[in-house]
């Protein structure tokens, strides 16, 4: 029995693009000197409401990026985007990284820095105000941004949870 549900996302059917967020060089000290390795954080998305992130580790930069892309394709989530922005304000925390995202009017642009900008660009969000608080570690900032985007509830979900119609939700 397969576990595929109506909400499962097949990354093979999406036109995913990738964006490199951060490359880190690590060193292992061995008898003959230092062995260098690399890890890469990559954000993948179709700029139409699907986004994911991946972490790849390898001895070469290109291999680490390729592994990150493959990992990112396995972690794709759907983001509800309304008129180019998010439906409501979000505060998400992962580790000591905290990300605040606020919806913005059309024409505002994507006001975000570093890792959060990459996540929102790949998701297809065009107008949003963000602030990254706490740790600036790209690993945790990306995870906090994705966690926040996952926690977005669109109007249909809210209406379903409250056992009301869509119009009743907006009237209250």
UniProtKB/Swiss-Prot annotation:
UniProt key word Ribonucleoprotein: yes
The organism of origin for this protein: Chlorobium phaeovibrioides (strain DSM 265 / 1930)
One term of GO molecular function: rRNA binding
Family matches, as InterPro entries: Ribosomal_Su5_D2-typ_SF, Ribosomal_uS5, Ribosomal_uS5_bac-type, Ribosomal_uS5_C, Ribosomal_uS5_N, Ribosomal_uS5_N_CS, Ribsml_uS5_D2-typ_fold_subgr
Keywords for the protein's UniProt record, in alphabetical order: Ribonucleoprotein, Ribosomal protein, RNA-binding, rRNA-binding
Function statement: With S4 and S12 plays an important role in translational accuracy. Located at the back of the 30S subunit body where it stabilizes the conformation of the head with respect to the body.
Protein name: Small ribosomal subunit protein uS5
Cellular component annotations (GO), alphabetically ordered: small ribosomal subunit
Domain S5 DRBM: 16-79
Recorded domain comment: The N-terminal domain interacts with the head of the 30S subunit; the C-terminal domain interacts with the body and contacts protein S4. The interaction surface between S4 and S5 is involved in control of translational fidelity.
């Amino acid at each position: 029995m397969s576990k595929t549900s109506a909400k499962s996302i097949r990354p093979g059917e999406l036109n995913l693009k990738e964006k490199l967020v951060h490359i880190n060089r690590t060193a292992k000290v061995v008898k003959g000197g230092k062995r260098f390795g690399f890890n890469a954080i990559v954000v993948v998305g179709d700029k139409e409401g699907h986004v994911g992130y991946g972490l790849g580790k390898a001895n070469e930069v290109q291999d680490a990026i390729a592994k990150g892309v493959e990992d990112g394709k396995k972690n794709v989530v759907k983001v509800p985007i309304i008129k180019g922005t998010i439906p409501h304000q979000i505060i998400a925390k992962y580790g000591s990284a905290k990300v605040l995202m606020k919806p913005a009017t059309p024409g505002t642009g994507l006001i975000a820095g570093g890792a959060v900008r990459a996540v929102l660009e790949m998701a297809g969000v065009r107008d949003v105000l963000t602030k990254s608080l706490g740790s600036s570690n790209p690993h945790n900032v990306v995870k906090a941004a994705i966690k926040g985007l996952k926690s977005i509830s669109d109007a249909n979900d809210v209406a379903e949870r409250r056992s009301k119609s869509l119009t009743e939700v907006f009237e209250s």
